[in-house]
């Protein structure tokens, strides 16, 4: 009997090991980054800091998310982002603000840089939406905090869906990337307009 059990366990182990090399490969995706910043003086004499981008737990992990109903979200096991969506967003935002040439400097909060203004945000949605038409949904909100006065001086909310041109995961990624780019450009334009209307160092 014990011999039979040992043979059965050995057979199961062999079957398990034989399947180890035949698993489906994991595919990783990322978003496009802006061009490097031009070496020109910033329009605004502001050292801008980009703070935390908070998000629900599903957006703090790498599997690409999809929504099948108003209350149900799942993730793809073999299709993932190279970084969690909130990190991808933050990195692209910093690069975009640097590339704009609007600021004296743009750095991540907690770095050696110091600044009066902190831009922080929250990511609400970053997923494929499966309905009559497949779409890439992004919802996010940002606020500009003045460390000197202790007040939020500007905020912006963005929520848009981008049609997915195809049924492949790569098409979903492209739609989310396009949507994110559009949303962050809105944020950058709104920030620039705030500082144009409220020049730093002038009463």
What are these regions (language model features)?
Residues 71-80, 148-182, 186:
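Short secondary-structure boundary motifs at beta->alpha junctions and helix caps
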Residues 1-18:
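Sec-dependent bacterial lipoprotein signal peptides
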Residues 21-43, 95, 99-151:
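Surface-exposed short loop/turn segments
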Residues 20-86, 194-203:
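A structural "domain/chain start" motif
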Residues 99-105, 189-203:
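Surface-exposed helix-capping loop/turn segments at secondary-structure junctions
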Residues 86, 90-94, 100, 177-180, ...:
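Extracytoplasmic/secreted envelope proteins and their assembly/folding machinery
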Residues 53, 122-126, 159-160:
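Generic short beta-strand segments
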């Amino acid at each position: 009997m014990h011999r039979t059990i040992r043979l059965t366990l050995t057979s199961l182990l062999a079957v398990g090991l034989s399947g180890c090399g035949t698993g489906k490969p994991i595919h990783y995706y990322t978003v496009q980054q802006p061009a490097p910043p031009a070496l020109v003086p910033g329009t605004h004499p502001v050292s801008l800091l980009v703070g935390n981008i908070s998000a629900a737990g599903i957006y703090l992990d790498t599997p690409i998310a999809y929504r099948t109903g108003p209350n149900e979200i799942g993730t793809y096991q073999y299709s993932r982002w190279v970084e969690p969506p909130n990190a991808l967003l933050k990195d692209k935002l910093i690069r975009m603000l640097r590339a704009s040439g609007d600021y004296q400097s743009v750095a991540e909060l907690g770095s050696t840089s110091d600044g009066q203004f902190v831009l922080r945000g929250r990511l609400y949605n970053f997923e494929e939406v499966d309905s009559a038409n497949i779409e890439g949904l992004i919802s996010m909100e940002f606020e500009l905090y003045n460390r000197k006065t202790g007040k939020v001086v500007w905020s912006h909310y963005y929520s848009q869906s981008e049609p997915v041109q195809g049924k492949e995961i790569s098409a979903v990624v492209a739609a989310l990337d396009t949507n994110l780019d559009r949303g962050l450009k809105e944020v950058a334009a709104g920030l620039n307009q705030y500082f144009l209307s409220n020049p730093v160092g002038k009463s």
